[in-house]
Amino acid sequence: MSGNSIGQNFVVTTFGESHGVALGCIIDGCPPGLELTEADMQHDLDRRRPGTSRYTTARREPDEVRILSGVFEGKTTGTSIGLLIENTDQRSQDYSNIKDLFRPGHADYTYQQKYGMRDYRGGGRSSARETAMRVAAGAVAKKYLKQVHCIEIYGFMSQLGPICAETIDLDQIEQNAFFFPDASKLEALDEYMRELKKSGDSIGAKISVIATGVPVGLGEPVFDRLDADIAHALMGINAVKGVEIGDGFGVVTQKGSEGRDLMSPQGFESNHAGGVLGGISSGQPIIAHIALKPTSSISVPGQSMTAQGEMAEVVTKGRHDPCVGIRAVPIAEAMLAIVLMDHLLRHRAQNQDVRSLTPVLGMR
């Protein structure tokens, strides 16, 4: 299997399976001298960790990360950073009934056809369990971005099923299990999830992620545009079926006079473009949204077939998230951080000495 790495200067490579011994990652390209301990990563890992609320999977993994290399006396050395998280709460027997069955909507069929075999225990490498290492690597990037360049990244759930956030209160995001910014909708979310779990079904969600303090100039046109790499990274998250930058698909109904971000010496008047113009960061906040499909691991019976091509009915056992979007916020933050970190280092390598006479614009 290829495709386990992302980035050019800041490179993150992950390994491991859902029910394997451990998950791990290697980070190449992190600058030396960054103060780094396990605690710097643990906060975001705890935000993603399973079993923390009644709305997520009952699988309980401590997700305690260990630094294996690349850090000496509390600081990064500039060499490869090795990270490891052990799996401790696997129940592989829960998946014995699908050993020879393909779960509709999952990667079972495509993995079998591509590799001639598959790890049926929790989906193996295709499981979102792998994203724990992305979150750990993203936490390293987030610390460097904030500490050295004052770039901050935050995400929130903007929609769960039919329930949309109508107000954005950033102080609310970490105060509830949904990472939802609208406190007036929490009761409705709780009731909706209760009924959903009773029915044995699942639901999709929309996650928004924003980066502030991003300098103008990040992005490498033509094929390594900043928004293209952000979309690539976010689309690589399990269950993501759509990505928007700025107004995204909303631009279809906009007129040019409405969607352009007017500017003056005092700054931009709007940010319909989501902080990227011509594939290069404009200095405005980077704004992206992702749509996550409902998980197909549900207890509602569904038609499928066996590995031998015979018709069969599938009921997925095991412990699963009724809405995978609930734990996707720190994952989306991590992927955006990894892309920005990579592009920041690439920009520094080529354009560090560039001095433009044009004033840098902010938001009015």
UniProtKB/Swiss-Prot annotation:
<keyword id="KW-0456">Lyase</keyword>
<dbReference type="Pfam" id="PF01264">
    <property type="entry name" value="Chorismate_synt"/>
</dbReference>
<comment type="function">
    <text>This reaction introduces a second double bond into the aromatic ring system.</text>
</comment>
<comment type="pathway">
    <text>Metabolic intermediate biosynthesis; chorismate biosynthesis; chorismate from D-erythrose 4-phosphate and phosphoenolpyruvate: step 7/7.</text>
</comment>
<dbReference type="GO" id="GO:0008652">
    <property type="term" value="P:amino acid biosynthetic process"/>
</dbReference>
<feature type="binding site">
    <location>
        <position position="319"/>
    </location>
    <ligand>
        <name>FMN</name>
    </ligand>
</feature>
<keyword id="KW-0521">NADP</keyword>
<feature type="binding site">
    <location>
        <begin position="293"/>
        <end position="297"/>
    </location>
    <ligand>
        <name>FMN</name>
    </ligand>
</feature>
<dbReference type="GO" id="GO:0004107">
    <property type="term" value="F:chorismate synthase activity"/>
</dbReference>
<dbReference type="GO" id="GO:0009423">
    <property type="term" value="P:chorismate biosynthetic process"/>
</dbReference>
<feature type="binding site">
    <location>
        <begin position="125"/>
        <end position="127"/>
    </location>
    <ligand>
        <name>FMN</name>
    </ligand>
</feature>
<dbReference type="GO" id="GO:0009073">
    <property type="term" value="P:aromatic amino acid family biosynthetic process"/>
</dbReference>
<dbReference type="InterPro" id="IPR035904">
    <property type="entry name" value="Chorismate_synth_AroC_sf"/>
</dbReference>
<comment type="similarity">
    <text>Belongs to the chorismate synthase family.</text>
</comment>
<feature type="binding site">
    <location>
        <position position="54"/>
    </location>
    <ligand>
        <name>NADP(+)</name>
    </ligand>
</feature>
<keyword id="KW-0274">FAD</keyword>
<keyword id="KW-0285">Flavoprotein</keyword>
<keyword id="KW-0288">FMN</keyword>
<feature type="region of interest" description="Disordered">
    <location>
        <begin position="41"/>
        <end position="60"/>
    </location>
</feature>
<keyword id="KW-0057">Aromatic amino acid biosynthesis</keyword>
<dbReference type="GO" id="GO:0005829">
    <property type="term" value="C:cytosol"/>
</dbReference>
<feature type="binding site">
    <location>
        <position position="278"/>
    </location>
    <ligand>
        <name>FMN</name>
    </ligand>
</feature>
<comment type="subunit">
    <text>Homotetramer.</text>
</comment>
<dbReference type="InterPro" id="IPR020541">
    <property type="entry name" value="Chorismate_synthase_CS"/>
</dbReference>
<dbReference type="InterPro" id="IPR000453">
    <property type="entry name" value="Chorismate_synth"/>
</dbReference>
<feature type="binding site">
    <location>
        <position position="48"/>
    </location>
    <ligand>
        <name>NADP(+)</name>
    </ligand>
</feature>
<protein>
    <recommendedName>
        <fullName>Chorismate synthase</fullName>
        <ecNumber>4.2.3.5</ecNumber>
    </recommendedName>
</protein>
<keyword id="KW-0028">Amino-acid biosynthesis</keyword>
<dbReference type="GO" id="GO:0010181">
    <property type="term" value="F:FMN binding"/>
</dbReference>
<feature type="binding site">
    <location>
        <begin position="238"/>
        <end position="239"/>
    </location>
    <ligand>
        <name>FMN</name>
    </ligand>
</feature>
